[in-house]
A protein has these predicted regions:
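Pyridoxal 5′-phosphate
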Residues: 1-153
């Protein structure tokens, strides 16, 4: 038996009082439709940027890419051997480049358990960095990131 979330009249539904907010419902439906229309194009753009970043990062001897090739192109996880992730984060922050350490699900751990499961290497899982991309990311930003990263290794 469900209890009402908001008490009041039950002319529309027994679970919520009041009239459904039609303008909000219509606005949400339109926003969802627009997002779904642009999603395939945005996905391909982000995939292209991710591929460029991968191609450039594998050229650097001290870097290991942890994200699998078929993983989401919106997140690229990599490790830099011999450099603490916090040190690199601070160097990059000084250049207005922002990364995260480890993985979102292991931010309080000494190492990333999910990266360890992927790599079976504890050192790599301790030094992982997470680069997030979005539909608003650009190839120019990716090129600038690679340049800044190389200058800070």
């Amino acid at each position: 038996n469900l209890s009402p979330l908001i008490n009041g009249g039950d002319s529309q539904t027994i679970y919520r009082a009041g009239t459904p907010p039609l303008p909000l419902i219509a606005s949400f439906a339109k926003a969802l439709r627009l997002a779904l229309e642009e999603q395939p194009k945005a996905y391909l753009k982000v995939k292209e940027i991710n591929n460029y970043l991968r191609d450039e990062l594998i050229k650097i001897d001290s870097i290991t890419i942890n994200s699998k090739i078929d993983s989401s192109p919106y997140i690229l996880n990599f490790s830099i051997k011999g450099i603490k992730p916090e040190t690199m984060i601070h160097k990059l922050e000084a250049k207005d480049v922002y990364l995260s350490t480890k993985t979102a699900c292991s931010s309080k751990e000494d190492y990333s358990k999910s990266i360890y499961e992927l790599t079976k290497d504890k050192e790599i899982s301790k030094t992982s960095l997470r680069l997030s991309l979005s539909k608003d990311s650009t190839m120019e930003e990716a090129k600038e990131f690679i340049k800044i990263l190389k200058n800070n290794l």
